[in-house]
Amino acid sequence: MNKIGKAMLCTVLTGAMAVGAAGAADLGSLSPQGAKAYLNQITTLQNKYGKAAARTDDGFKGLLTGLSMAKLVDMDGDKIPELYCGAGLDGQHMYSYADGKIYALDIPEGVSNFATDVSPCADFYVDDTKAYLVDGHEIMNGFPVRYLTKQGKEIVTALTYTDAIDDDTGNHICTLNGESVTYHELSAAQVNFT
């Protein structure tokens, strides 16, 4: 696989027009009808979650609410980008456009938070042919991390791993696609994948 870059999509305080513009960076082969469908979907999500705003009340001052992330990402290399949207910590959505209609792709609703609770971020690995949405935290906590991509009209898992530290020995306890591996084998597989 080609080396791929890592892109972190972080929330920013945006309004309706800015969210729409955030995803309009690269339309690829997306038709005008597809672009309109994506814009309508952004509006639908803003109606559901609200426009991006920072809370000013109680102990959560600064926490972003509403639809605060929108990005076009070509997940499968077909030159027609998918629409990724994030609202708060539990409003992650992805859509694709094909055959004249928009459809939802099945991704976890919870945003894998790579920044802070105030500014949730989504993490992507991107190359010329595919993109991978990271589901999970790429830290040694023992919880699964999945790299999700699009195949056909579905989201599939391209790679899954866990990495934990044994409290008694300090050794890494790792798995790769469900199989036990050493830390060095996991590291090598990650380097080869990314």
Q: Where does each model-flagged region fall?
A:
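Bacterial N-terminal signal peptides that target proteins for export
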Residues: M1-L9
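Beta-propeller blade termini
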Residues: G66-M75, V118-K130
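Beta-propeller blade repeat segments, especially FG-GAP/WD-type strand-to-loop junctions
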Residues: Q92-I107, V145-Q151
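Short coil/turn segments at the loop-to-beta-strand junctions that recur within blades
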Residues: E109-N113
